Curated annotation (Swiss-Prot):
Top-level taxon: Bacteria
Protein name (record): Glucose-1-phosphate adenylyltransferase
Name of the gene this protein is made from: glgC
Family: Belongs to the bacterial/plant glucose-1-phosphate adenylyltransferase family.
A matching Pfam family: Hexapep_GlmU
Annotated GO biological process: glycogen biosynthetic process
Class of enzymatic activity (EC top level): transferase
Length: 418
C-alpha cells in the first residue's frame, strides 16, 4: 500500500478527557489539553497539527472533564475540513453511548464506547494519541513502520531519565525493536541495558489496524478484571500474546538538522513555566517558526502588539520575550517572558521570567518575577510577587522550583483578607 494511501485510510483518535491535576489551579476551569501554550495556541493543537501536517485529515477527539473551553476552541479553530472529501474532526463527549450509566472508565474504554462511530469512518488504521503533550512528529513515518513490520501494535517511545519514568509506561525491547516487557507507571522503573540512568518510556502513541483493535476492545469490555486502559491492560496483553513493536521517536521527530529531540509533558506548573521560558531563548529547543510544520490554532482577530512610552522607569519594552497580538505594553519593562493574546500592562510595572495567559491586566507598579498568571486575571496596583517566597506562599501557589501561580480566585481571597 502506498504511503499516500496509508494516510488517507487512517485516522487519529485523540484522548482529551484528562484533567491534568498536577497543573493545579490551571485546570480548575478547563481540561489540560485546552490549557493555552506558546503565546496563542492550546496544548491539543500540537497533536492535531502533527496529524494534519502528516497528511491525516480524519480526527476524533474524546472529551470528558470540563470540556467547554476545549470544544469551543475546536469549533472556532478546526472547522476547515471538507466533508465531501471524507475529512472531519468529530468531538466525542462521554455520553454513556453503550447503554450503561458509566462515563469513560479508561483510555481504552473511551474508544470502546465509540466503536460504532469509528466503524462508520471506514478506516484501516487508527492512531491513538494523548492530547496533552508538546512535540512535533510525523505520524506518517510511524504508520509506515507499523505496516512494514506487520505489528499488532506499534508504540511510540523515547528515552527519559529513569527516575522520571514513574509517570510513564516503561518498556524493554529486543534487537529487532519488538517489545519484550511493558510496565505502566512502575514505582521502580527498569533501566535501559546500556544506560542505568535512563529508561525507555511510552509516549502514549499507539498505531493499530482497526480490525485488530476492535476485537481487542470488545474482549476487554467483557473482562471484569480490566481497568480498560491501554497502558495497564491492552498493551501488556499484546506484548505477552502478540507482536508489539517500539517506534523510536527520533526517527519521526520534526526538527532542524542538529536540533535536539523535543517532547514535553507540561503536566506540572514547573514544566509548563520552563517550556515557555525556553521559547524566549535565542535558539529555543522547540521551533514554533518552522513554516514547513506549522502549529495550527484558532487566531483571534486582534491588532498587533503595541508598546507605549519612552521615559526613564516608564518605558514600554520587551527584551528576549514573546508578545502576542492584542497586547498593549504601556510603560512596562518585560524581560524573558511570554505574554499571550490580549495582555495589557500599565506604567512602572515589571515582568521578569513571567508567563502571562490571555486577557490579563497588570496594573501600575506591579512587579512579577518567575510567575505563571492564569487567564483573565486583574493584577492589582503595586502587587509584588517573586521576591519574598514566604509572603507569596500565604496567598499563591509556589511550586517546588519556586514558580508562583497566580489566579483571580487567589487574588480575590487576598483582597478580602487585607
Amino acid at each position: 500500500m502506498e504511503t499516500k494511501r496509508l494516510t488517507q485510510r487512517s485516522m487519529v483518535f485523540v484522548l482529551a478527557g484528562g484533567r491534568g491535576s498536577r497543573l493545579k489551579e490551571l485546570t480548575d476551569r478547563r481540561v489540560k489539553p485546552a490549557v493555552p501554550f506558546g503565546g496563542k495556541a492550546r496544548i491539543i493543537d500540537f497533536a492535531l497539527s502533527n496529524a494534519l501536517n502528516s497528511g491525516i485529515r480524519k480526527m476524533a477527539i474524546a472529551t470528558q472533564y470540563k470540556a467547554h473551553s476545549l470544544i469551543r476552541h475546536l469549533q472556532r479553530g478546526w472547522t476547515f475540513f471538507r466533508a465531501e472529501r471524507n475529512e472531519f474532526l468529530d468531538i466525542l463527549p462521554a455520553s454513556q453511548r453503550t447503554g450503561t450509566e458509566a462515563w469513560y472508565a479508561g483510555t481504552a474504554d473511551a474508544v470502546t464506547q465509540n466503536i460504532d462511530i469509528v466503524d462508520s469512518y471506514d478506516v484501516d488504521y487508527v492512531i491513538i494519541l494523548a492530547g496533552d503533550h508538546i512535540y512535533k512528529m510525523d505520524y506518517e513515518v510511524m504508520l509506515r513502520e507499523h505496516v512494514e513490520t506487520g505489528a499488532d501494535v506499534t508504540v511510540g517511545c523515547l528515552t527519559v531519565p529513569r527516575m522520571e519514568a514513574t509517570a510513564f509506561g516503561v518498556m524493554a525491547t529486543d534487537e529487532t525493536g519488538k517489545i519484550t516487557s511493558f510496565l505502566e507507571k512502575p514505582a521502580d522503573p527498569p533501566a535501559m541495558p546500556d544506560d542505568p540512568n535512563s529508561a525507555l518510556a511510552s509516549m502514549g502513541i499507539y498505531v493499530f489496524k482497526w480490525s485488530f483493535l476492535r476485537e481487542l476492545l470488545v474482549a476487554d469490555a467483557l473482562d471484569t478484571n480490566s481497568s480498560h486502559d491501554f497502558g495497564h491492560d491492552l498493551i501488556p496483553e499484546i506484548v505477552e500474546n502478540g507482536k508489539a513493536m517500539a517506534h523510536r521517536y527520533d526517527r519521526s521527530c520534526v526538527r532542524a538538522d542538529g536540533a535536539p529531540v523535543y517532547w514535553k509533558d507540561v503536566g506540572t506548573v514547573d514544566a509548563f513555566w520552563e517550556a515557555h521560558i525556553d521559547l524566549t531563548n535565542f535558539t529555543p529547543d522547540l521551533d514554533l517558526w518552522d513554516k514547513n510544520w506549522p502549529i495550527w490554532t484558532y487566531s483571534e482577530s486582534v491588532p498587533p502588539a503595541k508598546f507605549i512610552h519612552d521615559e526613564r522607569d516608564r518605558r514600554g519594552m520587551a527584551i528576549s520575550s514573546m508578545v502576542a497580538g492584542g497586547c498593549i505594553i504601556s510603560g512596562t519593562e518585560v524581560r524573558n517572558s511570554c505574554l499571550f493574546t490580549g495582555v495589557h500592562t500599565n506604567s512602572y510595572a515589571v515582568l521578569d521570567h513571567a508567563v502571562v495567559l490571555p486577557n490579563v491586566v497588570v496594573n501600575r507598579h506591579a512587579r512579577l518575577r518567575k510567575v505563571v498568571v492564569d487567564s483573565d486575571v486583574v493584577v492589582p496596583e503595586g502587587l509584588v510577587v517573586g521576591e519574598d517566597p514566604t509572603e507569596d506562599a500565604k496567598w499563591f501557589r509556589v511550586s517546588e522550583r519556586g514558580v508562583t501561580l497566580i489566579t483571580q480566585d487567589m487574588l480575590d481571597k487576598r483582597a478580602q483578607a487585607q
